[in-house]
Amino acid sequence: VKREIIEKYGGWKFFLLTEDIQFTVKNIIDGEKIGYCKNAILFDEQPVTFKQSWSQRLRWSRGYIQVALKYGAALLKGTFVKFDYSCYDMTMNIMPLSIIGITSIVTNIIGLILIAIMSPENLVPAAWIVGKMIFGLYMSFFVFGFITMVTAWKKIYCNPVRKIFSLFTFPLFMFTYMPIIVASLFKKVEWKQIDHT
């Protein structure tokens, strides 16, 4: 980040739960060029426990909602009026997981409840369809993980057995985002220190 960018805003003025995403979105809306750097190396520390991971992802989910509420209209305007690809890219980054995830959960639960009440004999076939959808989602996450693993194999620093094992557990990890997204709508979420590796 250029110093001039920070000075333009009069210092760091980004304090939502995902301040890095907020900063990026604000710059895109203001017309700054944000780009992909193929050779960039990201050093990321991971939470030590699943509970800490849950807390971190709860904060991220709530932060994405905050950013969507604050900047969503401007991003949509940039996408559909100015045809700005960067606005589209960030819209797809911040909105789909929460909106599609919550819509999917609510729709499936309501659908199963209505079927159970109005047509109990169709509950098993309906549950079977939902099960197939869940399996399809699992396979989608598996394929995304596989593509990532193949393209970044040498940059993932763990033994090959663990890499392969993670292909099968990654979709399960991603499934835990569904209750996190729902919880982020109702639970008061604040920033707190997360121990990392």
What function would you assign to each model-found segment?
Residues 4, 40, 112-113, 180:
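Alpha-helix/helix-capping structural signal
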Residues 59, 97, 170-173:
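DHp/HisKA dimerization-phosphoacceptor four-helix bundle of two-component histidine kinases
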Residues 67, 108, 178-181:
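Amphipathic, well-ordered alpha-helical segments in soluble domains
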Residues 73-90, 113-197:
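Juxtamembrane C-terminal module of membrane proteins
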Residues 89, 93-97:
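Internal, well-ordered alpha-helical scaffold/interface segments
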Residues 96-104, 137-139:
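Select subsegments of transmembrane alpha-helices in polytopic membrane proteins
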